[in-house]
C-alpha cells in the first residue's frame, strides 16, 4: 500500500504547522502558496514547496493535484480564494478536499460546494483551551460530528474505585468507555466489572454534553 500524499495550499501559521506535522509523521507533503517568502520558509520542511496561484487551473493540473490523496485548503486571510480553490479542486477530481473555515457561514458555503471535510482550527482550539481551563480532568477531544466526540480525560474523583457498571456511564448516559490507560498499560474495551482508579486516563465515546458533564465532576 502506497504512503498517503498530502498537499497543503496556504502556508500561514496553521498551514505551516500542518506541513511540519505531516512531514514528521513520515508522509509526503507538497506546500503551495502564492507568497514566495512563505514558500522559502517551508523548503526545508515539506517534501516539495511550490510558489503558485491556487486559483490557476492550469497550474494545479501541472502540479498533478488530482493525484494527491488529500488536499488541505488552509488559506485563511482570503475567503474568496479559499472558496474558489475548493471549487476548483473538486472540479479537478481531487479525492478528498479538506477546507479551513473562518466562521459558521463560511463553513456552510464550503459544505455546499463539496468540501469533504470543513475544519475550524481557531474555534476548536478555543473550545479545547476553555475546557482545559474549567476542568481538571479534560485532556483531549476528537470531534466525530457536531454532537458526538471521543474524549480523553482523567478519572473524576467521584468515579474512582467504582466499576464501570457502578458508574452508570453507559446505562444512564450512553457513554461508552473504549479504553483505559493505566500507567504504561492500556486496557482496550474494558469489561463492565473493570474498576476505575485515581489517575486512570479514560477514553470514551458519547455526546458532547454528556462527556463535558463527566469531565466536570469533582
Language-model segments: what does each one mean?
Residues 1-218:
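Cytosolic regulatory regions of ion transport systems
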Amino acid at each position: 500500500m502506497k504512503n498517503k500524499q498530502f498537499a497543503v495550499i496556504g502556508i500561514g501559521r496553521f498551514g505551516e504547522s500542518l506541513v511540519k506535522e505531516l512531514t514528521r509523521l513520515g508522509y509526503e507533503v507538497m506546500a503551495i502558496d502564492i507568497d514566495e517568502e512563505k514558500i522559502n520558509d517551508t523548503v526545508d520542511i515539506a517534501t516539495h514547496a511550490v510558489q503558485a496561484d491556487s486559483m490557476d487551473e492550469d497550474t494545479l493540473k501541472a502540479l498533478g493535484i488530482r493525484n494527491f490523496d488529500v488536499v488541505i485548503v488552509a488559506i485563511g486571510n482570503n475567503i474568496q480564494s479559499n472558496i474558489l480553490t475548493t471549487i476548483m479542486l473538486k472540479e479537478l477530481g481531487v479525492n478528498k478536499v479538506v477546507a479551513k473555515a473562518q466562521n459558521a457561514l463560511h463553513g456552510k458555503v464550503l459544505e455546499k460546494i463539496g468540501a469533504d471535510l470543513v475544519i475550524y482550527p481557531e474555534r476548536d482550539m478555543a473550545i479545547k483551551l476553555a475546557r482545559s481551563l474549567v476542568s481538571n480532568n479534560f485532556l483531549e477531544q476528537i470531534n466525530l460530528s457536531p454532537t458526538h466526540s471521543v474524549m480523553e480525560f482523567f478519572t473524576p474523583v467521584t468515579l474512582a474505585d467504582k466499576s464501570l457498571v457502578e458508574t452508570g456511564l453507559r446505562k444512564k448516559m450512553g457513554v461508552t468507555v473504549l479504553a483505559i490507560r493505566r500507567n504504561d498499560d492500556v486496557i482496550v474495551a474494558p469489561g463492565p466489572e473493570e474498576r476505575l482508579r485515581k489517575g486512570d486516563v479514560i477514553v470514551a465515546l458519547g455526546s458532547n454534553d454528556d462527556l463535558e458533564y463527566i469531565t466536570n465532576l469533582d
